[in-house]
Structures are given as structure tokens and as C-alpha cells.
Swiss-Prot record:
This is Temporin-ALi. Keywords: Amidation, Amphibian defense peptide, Antibiotic, Antimicrobial, Cleavage on pair of basic residues, Fungicide, Immunity, Innate immunity, Secreted, Signal. Antimicrobial peptide with activity against Gram-positive and Gram-negative bacteria and against fungi. Has been tested against S.aureus (MIC=7.5 ug/mL), B.pumilus (MIC=7.5 ug/mL), B.cereus (MIC=75.0 ug/mL), E.coli (MIC=7.5 ug/mL), B.dysenteriae (MIC=20.0 ug/mL), A.cacoaceticus (MIC=60.0 ug/mL), P.aeruginosa (MIC=5.0 ug/mL) and C.albicans (MIC=5.0 ug/mL). Also shows a weak hemolytic activity. Coiled coil: none annotated. Residues 1-22 form the signal peptide. It is found in: Secreted. The keyword Signal applies. The modification Leucine amide is found at L59. The lineage of its organism: Eukaryota, Metazoa, Chordata, Craniata, Vertebrata.
Amino acid sequence: MFPLKKSLLLLFFLATINLSLCEQERNAEEERRDEPDERNAEVEKRFFPIVGKLLSGLLGK
């Protein structure tokens, strides 16, 4: 019974640390995206390739 409790406790702590690290990384990414110019650049990077693919599909190229 003791080894099972010990391994479950270890698993719990490792999962907690992992979630904490993920949350810190997500917060850092959100801070980087706070500037509107960077947000607009990201939208443009995602938008133009999609439009290009749609237009090339419609034009038959």
C-alpha cells in the first residue's frame, strides 16, 4: 500500500509542476502578443496564405 501511495503522490507533484510550467509559458506568450502591431502581423501571416490558396483554387492554377 505504501509504494502505491508514494507513486501516486509523486505523480501528483509532477503533474502540478507540469501544469505550472505550462501556465507560465502561456502567460509569457500572452504578454508578447499584447502589442497591437504584433497581433496584426500574426493575423496577416495567417490570412494571406489562406486567401492565396482560395484564389489559386478558384482560378484553377
